[in-house]
């Protein structure tokens, strides 16, 4: 499960507080002790602080590109210089570890949007691996999420008159048309197309797949616990999908709108102060609104997975494309922090990741990596290795030139 803090979370105000830094750097939040001795987080994260034994924080993420779309493409591919047709890590996992035919292998909750969005080819196409390993997208529009009353996933929202028998009749008609149109030797591309068509029909007819998307089947107290906002309900949906057999779920961490806010974009974490909301304010684009909700929802997810016996077999990742500048600046209309890729933080949990751990270290202002830098390649290799995939697996179009990752896992699986 990969949670994208789209826009770039401030490391100083969350995972890597610096209480001894000058006032114009450290911000207003005090450090908060976690359940792990010697490990502190920002004070807006009390719920994650209480379950620190379930995750590891990397404080030494680093690259050199302060541009949203490019940095997002790097994060998606696990590469500092991805090709235009590089598959995302999600598509690689889908190719090597597909789900059962009656479940989608890869689901994406909440579409990237706004000026920070990576090219759709970087996450929706499957790259050179092809569209068969691209994700099933839920959340084309910002309101298309389980927190919206009456939510129903578009891929499963077929017309009432399209009964199971009519759908099966269409499948048979398609098969007959295909078989009658070719009297020659089977074409590999045509065979693959038929396989994909059959998989699509299986998904449409799968009660298990459709029911996994019904978040309203959850008890009200569970929905309340996750949070009645887009991010909380998407995390709950992600848990249901993983539990049902989906191999990978990506979630864009859009936290929804604060009271009286108008919709601007889903770039919650891009907190320059340019949207009329300061980074420390309580609007949709401020930490005062976004971080407590992310904290409560993520802590609930980790506890819920653990209680269900799923955490040991489920990798949970939370990261953005970069961090924020140590120095607080003035944006167009309020104060904020700007893009900072040189040193930032990410979280990993489950699937054998050591809990209660901090990997790497930053300097006294969280501006530069002091110890054990983690590149996009290393981060990607760590995800693959934790999923049981050898990063050296050859996946390039010719079958041997390019490995799945050029990085080194920071943990041994």
Spell out what each predicted region is.
Residues 2-413:
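Ligand-binding pockets and gating/stacking loops
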